[in-house]
């Protein structure tokens, strides 16, 4: 059944284009984000988790236990370059110091609750965190090039309620902390044995990060930014900012900050070319309409002809896939360094949408391509394990609901 989109009669919130309003809105987002803060990264016995701490925080902890700050540099190397989780494996640190570190600290990973591998070799991890909450991470291999992307979650659940997205049916529980965000990538590396970190001239199986998992990363910006700085540090995991892409549904006030401070690649979950439709399928549009979103894209400092903004567009049959939609999309992005990823809708239990026909996908792609924009049609990956775009939702929640007896 094709979903029916009803016109929205709610008034649109006024523009937040001015600097003062943007600053006020960023503060509002920060305050709201704090309500969903992750738990402190500390064990019940009081030991502190060292994963997710900045270099400065590591140095301060060393001072607290009576050690020289240079110990932080040693720990950084062992934690993020070597991937060590046991202090006794840190052979450049004397044994008495290893014991002292183990008394005060841990180097942890999220627990792998389940791990599934698709027929196309896509692998989905359900990671469980210290408080029992869970999020999904997906590794998408490109065997032709011996490389692959790690799709990382930034929140448990999501607050956006996009109507075509499975994650949107799971309410936001909380934000993930830096240790939990970095930990997803580190645990995936553990699974593939990719330690120590490969040098710049060596191939990496886990070669890129896409912040396209569960949650809206710009609604958890502080924790995401801290995690990405750790991952980009040249003496640790050392993943270039050019190999990291953040996907947002359009949290306009935070886009400038992300570009200025992180300079990572930007992807926009667009999915509609009119405010009337986008208000319905991406409700965040009611706060930050398309005009403001495109203006923020024009300002994004990391965008260039060599680092184009990616516009993600899930093709929904009879909803957003007409030739007129394609022409309007071209008009919207006409002065941007951009490419368009056309994504066939990936069905999930309970959804009313249907994927566009192959013929309509091709027509749409050709219109965009003829206007000078790359418009590949994405090949669905991991559909059989609900790991494809728009399908993520913690499997444990689904299992619990199906196993709960009726009263």
UniProtKB/Swiss-Prot annotation:
Co-factor(s): [4Fe-4S] cluster
Binding site for S-adenosyl-L-methionine: 215-216, 247, 269-271, 346
Chemical reaction(s) catalysed: adenosine(2503) in 23S rRNA + 2 reduced [2Fe-2S]-[ferredoxin] + 2 S-adenosyl-L-methionine = 2-methyladenosine(2503) in 23S rRNA + 5'-deoxyadenosine + L-methionine + 2 oxidized [2Fe-2S]-[ferredoxin] + S-adenosyl-L-homocysteine; adenosine(37) in tRNA + 2 reduced [2Fe-2S]-[ferredoxin] + 2 S-adenosyl-L-methionine = 2-methyladenosine(37) in tRNA + 5'-deoxyadenosine + L-methionine + 2 oxidized [2Fe-2S]-[ferredoxin] + S-adenosyl-L-homocysteine
Iron-sulfur recorded as keyword: yes
GO biological process, one term: rRNA base methylation
EC numbers: 2.1.1.192
Binding sites annotated in the UniProt record for [4Fe-4S] cluster: 158, 162, 165
Positions of the catalytic residues: 136, 389
Broadest EC class assigned to this enzyme: transferase
Domain Radical SAM core: 144-378
Cellular component aspect of the GO annotation: cytoplasm
One Pfam family of this chain: RlmN_N
An annotated Gene Ontology molecular function: metal ion binding
PROSITE patterns from the UniProt entry: RADICAL_SAM (PS51918)
Compartments where found: Cytoplasm
Swiss-Prot/TrEMBL keywords: 4Fe-4S, Cytoplasm, Disulfide bond, Iron, Iron-sulfur, Metal-binding, Methyltransferase, rRNA processing, S-adenosyl-L-methionine, Transferase, tRNA processing
Principal localisation: cytoplasm
Biological role stated in the UniProt entry: Specifically methylates position 2 of adenine 2503 in 23S rRNA and position 2 of adenine 37 in tRNAs. m2A2503 modification seems to play a crucial role in the proofreading step occurring at the peptidyl transferase center and thus would serve to optimize ribosomal fidelity.
Cross-referenced HAMAP family: RNA_methyltr_RlmN
Record's miscellaneous remark: Reaction proceeds by a ping-pong mechanism involving intermediate methylation of a conserved cysteine residue.
Annotated protein name in UniProt: Dual-specificity RNA methyltransferase RlmN
Species, as recorded: Gluconobacter oxydans (strain 621H) (Gluconobacter suboxydans)
Organism classification: Bacteria, Pseudomonadati, Pseudomonadota, Alphaproteobacteria, Acetobacterales
């Amino acid at each position: 059944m094709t979903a029916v989109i009803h016109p929205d009669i709610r008034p649109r919130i006024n523009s937040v284009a001015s600097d003062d309003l943007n600053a006020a809105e960023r503060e509002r987002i920060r305050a709201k984000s704090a309500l969903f803060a992750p738990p402190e990264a500390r064990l019940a016995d009081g030991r502190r988790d060292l994963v997710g701490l900045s270099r400065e925080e590591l140095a301060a902890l060393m001072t607290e236990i009576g050690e020289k700050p240079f110990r932080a540099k040693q720990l950084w190397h062992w934690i993020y370059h070597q991937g060590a989780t046991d202090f006794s494996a840190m052979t450049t640190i004397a044994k008495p110091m290893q014991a002292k570190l183990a008394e005060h600290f841990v180097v942890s990973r999220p627990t792998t609750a389940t791990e599934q591998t698709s027929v196309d070799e896509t692998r989905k991890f359900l990671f469980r965190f210290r408080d029992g909450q869970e999020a999904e991470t997906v590794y998408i291999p490109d065997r032709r090039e011996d490389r692959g992307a790690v799709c990382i979650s930034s929140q448990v659940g999501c607050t956006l309620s996009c109507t075509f997205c499975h994650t949107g049916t799971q309410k936001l529980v909380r934000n993930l902390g830096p240790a939990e965000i970095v930990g997803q990538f580190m645990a995936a590396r553990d699974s593939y044995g990719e330690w120590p970190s490969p040098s710049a001239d060596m191939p990496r199986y886990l070669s890129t990060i896409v912040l396209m998992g569960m949650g809206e990363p710009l609604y958890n910006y502080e924790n995401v930014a801290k995690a990405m700085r750790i991952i980009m540090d040249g003496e640790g995991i050392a993943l270039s900012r050019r190999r990291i892409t953040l996907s947002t549904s359009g949290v306009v006030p935070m886009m400038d900050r992300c570009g200025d401070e992180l300079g990572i690649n930007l992807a926009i979950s667009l999915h509609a070319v009119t405010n009337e439709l986008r208000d319905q399928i991406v409700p965040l549009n009611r706060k930050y309409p398309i005009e403001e979103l495109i203006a923020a894209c024009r300002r994004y400092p990391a965008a260039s002809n060599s680092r184009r903004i990616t516009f993600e567009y899930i093709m929904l049959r009879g909803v957003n896939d007409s030739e007129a939609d394609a022409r309007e999309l071209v008009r919207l992005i006409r002065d941007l360094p951009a490419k368009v990823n056309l994504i066939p809708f990936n069905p999930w239990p309970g959804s009313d949408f249907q994927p566009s026909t192959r013929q309509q996908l091709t027509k749409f792609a050709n219109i965009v391509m003829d206007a000078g924009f790359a418009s590949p049609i994405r090949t669905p990956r991991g559909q059989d394990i609900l790991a494809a775009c728009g399908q993520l939702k913690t499997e444990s929640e689904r299992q619990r609901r199906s196993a709960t007896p009726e009263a």
